[in-house]
A protein has these predicted regions:
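NAD-dependent ADP-ribosyltransferases
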Residues: 1-328
Length: 328
């Protein structure tokens, strides 16, 4: 995956042999893991400029931004607070259903190519489309769910709203789109392609510690057992979409590509150095697993001050338990 690129550090210098060895050790660790999945995000200079006031023409500064703040969903650019998926009240569930139905209807009336695709989706998923418009009928089933399952339902419905891409919701979306397919990522925007990963629990066991929220729009199994409306397939299944809540944290970024250059997250080198210091096989395995599930260690001591240089109106923190939104 990386062999086709000219590999550079965050200062735009070619990697030393030692750094190359560390990068490929990290890559091999991630590619052979059952606990993580590679993701890709195509990005445009226009979108980068809207966030950071810089783009791919100044990779040194862009690296500083991406490897400090990551990339944020538009909820962080907007004044509006949006809908909170952690609110598992019945009222919030009905609000989500009503909003999603409205976004689908508005998408159908858009008159563009996306509207045609949404129409195909609604015809194929008629049962879901009809059900989501009748949220009141599913209140009983929702109220019987455990709070954690309710939260996943909220995340799932809001991810569908994000994918449909209604103009109103798109401007305050609490997600960013990524894909498991690098070719697809470059189709969406080809000025830059961010490489990263998301945690993956192949055994579907409950984790001791919560990790970042995301929705794999092609996986419906968890929704099928709730008794609530769900889609038999993704809105746009060919996109192989992973919708990540709030944004892609720098802790889960490997680097980003601009044409034939690939800029590496410097936290990777620190992670491999730390791993080499661990003598015990068991401790080393636990350390690798921690990176795969919870990301790299990033020095964000001056994070809030750094964010003042961006166009973000808000930023979020995730402490392993809760997502918290902070105003600038």
């Amino acid at each position: 995956m990386l062999s086709n690129f000219r590999l550079l550090n965050s200062n735009s210098n070619e990697l030393t042999q030692e750094e190359l060895n560390k990068l490929f050790e990290f890559y091999n660790m991630m590619s052979g893991s059952l606990y993580s999945r590679f993701i890709f995000r195509g990005e445009s200079d226009r979108n980068l400029m809207r966030q950071f006031n810089v783009d791919t023409k100044t990779p040194g500064i862009l690296s500083e931004c991406l490897f400090m703040t990551g990339e944020k969903g538009r909820i962080c650019w907007a004044e509006n607070e949006g809908i909170n998926p952690d609110d598992v009240s019945t009222g919030n569930f009905l609000r989500i259903c009503t909003s999603l139905a409205k976004y689908i209807d508005e998408g159908l009336r858009a008159g563009d190519n996306r509207a045609k695709r949404i129409k195909v989706f609604c015809e194929k998923e008629e049962k879901f489309y009809d059900g989501i418009k009748k949220g009141e009928a599913f209140v009983g089933a929702y109220e019987e769910l455990k709070p954690e399952v309710k939260r996943k339902v909220n995340l799932y419905y809001l991810a569908i709203a994000h994918t449909i891409g209604d103009k109103e919701y798109r401007e305050i979306s609490g997600y960013i789109s990524t894909t498991t397919n690098a070719v697809i990522a470059n189709r969406f925007a080809h000025d830059a392609c961010i490489f990263g990963w998301v945690p993956y629990n192949i055994w579907k066991r409950r984790a001791r510690r919560r990790t970042i929220d995301y929705v794999d729009t092609n996986q419906m199994l968890e929704m099928q057992i709730t008794g609530l409306p769900y889609c038999d397939s993704a809105v746009f299944s060919n996109q192989e979409e992973i919708a990540i809540r709030c944004g892609l944290l720098p802790h889960f970024i490997i680097g980003y590509a601009v044409e034939q250059n690939f800029y590496v997250n410097p936290a990777i080198f620190n992670a491999i150095d730390r791993m080499h210091e661990i003598g015990s096989f068991r401790e080393k395995f636990a350390y690798k697993r921690r990176i795969q599930q919870h990301g790299l260690e990033i020095n964000q001591e001056n994070f809030e001050e750094f964010c003042q240089r961006t166009n973000f109106k808000k930023y979020f923190t995730f402490d392993g338990d809760d997502y918290t939104m902070h105003r600038m």
